[in-house]
């Protein structure tokens, strides 16, 4: 098998693992939001196990990337693909950690009702799932237009965050506490 063929096979395996990591992280985000909205303590607790698997994916993919860089010494486009994968796994792993943190929070929350419906939180979770999925899809398919759409979605996420923050400040002010 030629060196180029070996490289292409290793890159294909890298992309397959990256997609698997992404799909698991998407599910974790979905589960975290579902657990939060429904106050499902057991679902919240279960997310930690998936987070361990995402951590394993990160280590495995990082090793694969390093092996490719050291053995194949890619240049130009090939190097960018491997270095982009390294950056992506760090971000995807962080998303998994954050989903796990939400799960832990749900597990330890008291059983009181929410004072407000979590509609914007649900929208943020759905948007986060879409961003993770489309980020990896744009990388796998080398689709710059899709990557730019993900960047635009980040602005929507920022807007949702500001909306939630303002609503929380208003709720705190109504309660008589200092909302600033």
What are these regions (language model features)?
Residues 1-180:
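Cytosolic, long alpha-helical scaffolding segments
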């Amino acid at each position: 098998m030629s060196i180029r063929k070996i490289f292409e096979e290793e890159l294909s395996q890298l992309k397959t693992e990256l997609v698997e990591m992404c799909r698991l992280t998407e599910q974790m985000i979905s589960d975290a939001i579902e657990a939060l909205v429904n106050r499902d303590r057991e679902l919240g607790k279960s997310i930690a196990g998936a987070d361990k698997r995402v951590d394993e994916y990160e280590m495995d993919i990082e090793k694969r990337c390093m092996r490719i860089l050291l053995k194949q010494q890619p240049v130009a486009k090939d190097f960018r693909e491997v270095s982009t994968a390294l950056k992506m796994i760090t971000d995807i792993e962080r998303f998994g950690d954050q989903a796990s943190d939400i799960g832990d929070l749900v597990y330890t929350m008291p059983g009181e009702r929410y004072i407000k419906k979590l509609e914007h939180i649900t929208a943020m979770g759905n948007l986060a799932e879409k961003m993770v999925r489309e980020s990896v899809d744009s990388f796998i398919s080398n689709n710059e237009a899709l990557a730019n759409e993900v960047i635009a979605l980040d602005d929507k996420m920022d807007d949702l965050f500001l909306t939630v923050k303002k609503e929380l400040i208003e709720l705190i002010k109504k309660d008589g506490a200092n909302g600033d």
